[in-house]
C-alpha cells in the first residue's frame, strides 16, 4: 500500500512543478502537503466527510485528488481552476478560501449542522495563531465538538518565517514527541487499575508531571485530544496515525511536521521565494525577468527615510518581503515589526507607537487591511493618530482572484473620518508621497500602491495634497484619473484624438481631500466629464466628486469609469482590465458609447 501511495505522491509532485512553473502559484506549500493530502484521501471519504483548508493555497493536491486532475493545468488562468477553494467550482469545496483564519470558525458551523459527519480542518502553523482560529479553538474545546479533527500542518513558515509564541510552542511540541508515547503508556496503565483511589492519585500525578514537562497540557486543558507526527512526509508514519485518529471522538488535534517545498531542490533551499512564485524555469528555479514594481520603489524609499529618521517604524502582518520591507528589516530589525497574520493587532500596535511619538508605517495588502476595519475606526480615526498606511496590491491583482483583489479599501478609507488618502499615479509621485508622509502629523495617511510595473511622465510637477495636475489640455472632454488609470488613459490618448475626442487629462493623486478649487472653478467648462479609478464603483473616488458637486449646487453629468462589480474573477491583470472595459480598445469603446450613445 505505502509503495503505491509513494508512487502517487511522486506523480503529483511532478505535476505540481510542471504546472506552477508555467502558471505561477503556491508551489512550496503544496509540495509540503502531498503525503498528508494523499493519506487523507486514503483514510477518509472526501465525498462524505467535510474537508476544509485554511487559506486554501495548499489545496492544489486536494483539487487533483478530487474531480479536477484533468483541468489542473488551467489553474490561475482566466476561466480555469481557481487558485483557492471555491464551492462554485466543485462540490468537494465546502467553503470559499483565500484569507487566513476562516476554516476553524466555519468548521464549527459545519460540525454543529452535520453531527454525523466528520469535519477535517487542515490549518497551517501560522494561520492557527490568527485570532479567528484561536477563538474557534476555544469554542470547539469548550463545547467538546466530537466530530472535528484539526490537522495542524507545521512547516515552520507562513510566507516568511513564523513569528510569535505559538510558533515556539509548536516547536516545543514537536521536540516532545517521545513524551507523547510515554503519556499513552501511562494512560493505558492507569486505565487497567481497578482501585479507584489509587487510580485517581495516579491521574493527578500524571497531570502534574505533564504540566511541568510538556506543552500538551495546555492543549488538553482546552478540551482537545492531542497527537503528533514528527515525520509528516513519511507515509509509513503518517498513515497509521490518521487511521488511529479517524474514529476517535474529539475534538482532536493532530500536529503534522512537514517540509515546505519537499521534492524540488530549489523550493527546499528557498522556501520563502517558492511560497508563491511567478512562472519560472524548472531547470534553474529562476523566475523570468520582470520590470520594477511599485513595491520595490516603496522599499527603497522607506529605507532611505529610515536612515534619516530613527523614529520611523515599519509594520507588516506576515508580509515583510511582499510589501517591500525586506531591505528595511535587514538594516533596522529592531524597527521592523512582523506581527504574523494579525492585521488588527498590527494597526492597534501602530496606534500605540504613534501615541508615543513614533512614526509608524503599516504595510499591508489591500485585501488584508479589510480584516482591520474596526481598529482603523476605533483605534486610529477616533484619536486622529498619524499612522501611515501603505496599502499594497490595491486594485485588480490578477491570478490570485476574487479573494485577493484590492477593490474595497478606497471605499472604506473614504468613509472613515480624519483619513487622508493618496493614490500616486507615477513612481515619482509615490516617492514624493512618502517624503510628505515623513512629517505628516495631521492624522492618519493612506498611500495606495498597485500591483503593476512603474510608470512615469516627463516634467512632472510635484505632488501636493488637495491639488491635482493637468497633464494634457483640451476643451470638451475632461478625464480625471487617479492611481493606475492615469497611465491607462495616456496610453489611449493619441487614439482618442484620432477619433475626434478632444481630451483634458488631469492627474488626481489626492483622492481625499479632493481638489475643491479645480472642481469649483474649472469643471463647468467641459461637455463630458469622466472620472477613472481602479476601484469598486460604490462609495468611490467618483462618488466623492458627485457628492461635492451636489453639495455645491453644480449640476454636471459625471461618467464613472470604475469596476462595476465587487467580485472580480482570477486571470491576468491585463485580461481582467479589458473585460471590465478599463483598458485599451474596450475603454475607448466605452468612452465613445458614453459620449455618442453608441460606438463611433
Predicted ranges, named:
Residues 1-19, 266-282:
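Cofactor-/ligand-binding subdomain signature composed of acidic, glycine-rich
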Residues 18, 25-146, 311-312, 317, ...:
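Cofactor-binding active-site loop characterized by glycine-rich and histidine/acidic residues
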Residues 22-26, 123-127, 228-235, 364-369, ...:
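Conserved short loop/turn motifs at secondary-structure junctions
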Residues 31, 53-55, 123-124, 152-154, ...:
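Glycine-rich, histidine-containing beta strand-loop boundary motifs that form or position
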Residues 74-106, 112-116, 142-273, 289-291, ...:
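Thiamine diphosphate
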Residues 119, 123-124, 128, 132-136, ...:
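Extended, hydrophobic alpha-helical segments in both membrane/secreted and soluble proteins
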Residues 139, 218, 328, 352-353, ...:
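Hydrophobic/aromatic ligand-binding patch that stacks against planar heteroaromatic rings
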Residues 279, 414-458:
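Helix-enriched interaction subdomains in cytosolic or periplasmic regions
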Amino acid at each position: 500500500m505505502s509503495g503505491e501511495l509513494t508512487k502517487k505522491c511522486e506523480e503529483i509532485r511532478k505535476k505540481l512543478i510542471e504546472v506552477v512553473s508555467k502558471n505561477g502559484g503556491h508551489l512550496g506549500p503544496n509540495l509540503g502537503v502531498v503525503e498528508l493530502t494523499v493519506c487523507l484521501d486514503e483514510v477518509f471519504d472526501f465525498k462524505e466527510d467535510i474537508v476544509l483548508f485554511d487559506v486554501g493555497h495548499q489545496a492544489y493536491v486536494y483539487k487533483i485528488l478530487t474531480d479536477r486532475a484533468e483541468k489542473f493545468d488551467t489553474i490561475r488562468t482566466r476561466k480555469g481552476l481557481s487558485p483557492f477553494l471555491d464551492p462554485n467550482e466543485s462540490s468537494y469545496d465546502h467553503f470559499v478560501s483565500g484569507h487566513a483564519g476562516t476554516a476553524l470558525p466555519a468548521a464549527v458551523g459545519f460540525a454543529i449542522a452535520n453531527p454525523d459527519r466528520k469535519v477535517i480542518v487542515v490549518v497551517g502553523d501560522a494561520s492557527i495563531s490568527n485570532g479567528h482560529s484561536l477563538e474557534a479553538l476555544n469554542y470547539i474545546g469548550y463545547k467538546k465538538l466530537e466530530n472535528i479533527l484539526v490537522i495542524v500542518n507545521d512547516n515552520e513558515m507562513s510566507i516568511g518565517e513564523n513569528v510569535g509564541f505559538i510558533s515556539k510552542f509548536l516547536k516545543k511540541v514537536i521536540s516532545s514527541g517521545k513524551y507523547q508515547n510515554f503519556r499513552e503508556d501511562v494512560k493505558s496503565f492507569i486505565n487497567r487499575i481497578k482501585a479507584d483511589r489509587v487510580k485517581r492519585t495516579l491521574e493527578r500525578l500524571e497531570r502534574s508531571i505533564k504540566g511541568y514537562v510538556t506543552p500538551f497540557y495546555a492543549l488538553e486543558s482546552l478540551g482537545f485530544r492531542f497527537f503528533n507526527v514528527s515525520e509528516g512526509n513519511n507515509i509509513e508514519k503518517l498513515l497509521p496515525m490518521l487511521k488511529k485518529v479517524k474514529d476517535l471522538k474529539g475534538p482532536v488535534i493532530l500536529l503534522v511536521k512537514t517540509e515546505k517545498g519537499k521534492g524540488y531542490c530549489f523550493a527546499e533551499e528557498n522556501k520563502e521565494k517558492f511560497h508563491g512564485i511567478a512562472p519560472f524555469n524548472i531547470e534553474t528555479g529562476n523566475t523570468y525577468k520582470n520590470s520594477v514594481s511599485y513595491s520595490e520603489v516603496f522599499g527603497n524609499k522607506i529605507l532611505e527615510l529610515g536612515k534619516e529618521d530613527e523614529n520611523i517604524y515599519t509594520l507588516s502582518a506576515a508580509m515583510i518581503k511582499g510589501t517591500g520591507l525586506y531591505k528595511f528589516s535587514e538594516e533596522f530589525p529592531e524597527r521592523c515589526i512582523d506581527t504574523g497574520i494579525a492585521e488588527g493587532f498590527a494597526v492597534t500596535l501602530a496606534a500605540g507607537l504613534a501615541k508615543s511619538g513614533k512614526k509608524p508605517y503599516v504595510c499591508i495588502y489591500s485585501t488584508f487591511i479589510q480584516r482591520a476595519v474596526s481598529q482603523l475606526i476605533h483605534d486610529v480615526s477616533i484619536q486622529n493618530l498619524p499612522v501611515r498606511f501603505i496599502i499594497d496590491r490595491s486594485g485588480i491583482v490578477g491570478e490570485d482572484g476574487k479573494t485577493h483583489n484590492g477593490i474595497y479599501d478606497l471605499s472604506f478609507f473614504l468613509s472613515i473620518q480624519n483619513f487622508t488618502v493618496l493614490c500616486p499615479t507615477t513612481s515619482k509621485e509615490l516617492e514624493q508621497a512618502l517624503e510628505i508622509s515623513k512629517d505628516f502629523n495631521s492624522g492618519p495617511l493612506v498611500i495606495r500602491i498597485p500591483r503593476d510595473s512603474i510608470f512615469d511622465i516627463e516634467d512632472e510637477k510635484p505632488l501636493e495634497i488637495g491639488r491635482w495636475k493637468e497633464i494634457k489640455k483640451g476643451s470638451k472632454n475632461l478625464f480625471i484619473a487617479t492611481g493606475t488609470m492615469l497611465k491607462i488613459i495616456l496610453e489611449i490618448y493619441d487614439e482618442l484624438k484620432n477619433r475626434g475626442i478632444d481630451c483634458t487629462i488631469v492627474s488626481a493623486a489626492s483622492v481625499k481631500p479632493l481638489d475643491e478649487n479645480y472642481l469649483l472653478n474649472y469643471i463647468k467648462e467641459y461637455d463630458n466629464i469622466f472620472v477613472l479609478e481602479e476601484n469598486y464603483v460604490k462609495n468611490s473616488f467618483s462618488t466623492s466628486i458627485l457628492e461635492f458637486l451636489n453639495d455645491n449646487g453644480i449640476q454636471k453629468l459625471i461618467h464613472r469609469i470604475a469596476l462595476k462589480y465587487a467580485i472580480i474573477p482570477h486571470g491576468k491583470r491585463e485580461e481582467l482590465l479589458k473585460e471590465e472595459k478599463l483598458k485599451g480598445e474596450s475603454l475607448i469603446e466605452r468612452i465613445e458609447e458614453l459620449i455618442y450613445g453608441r460606438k463611433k
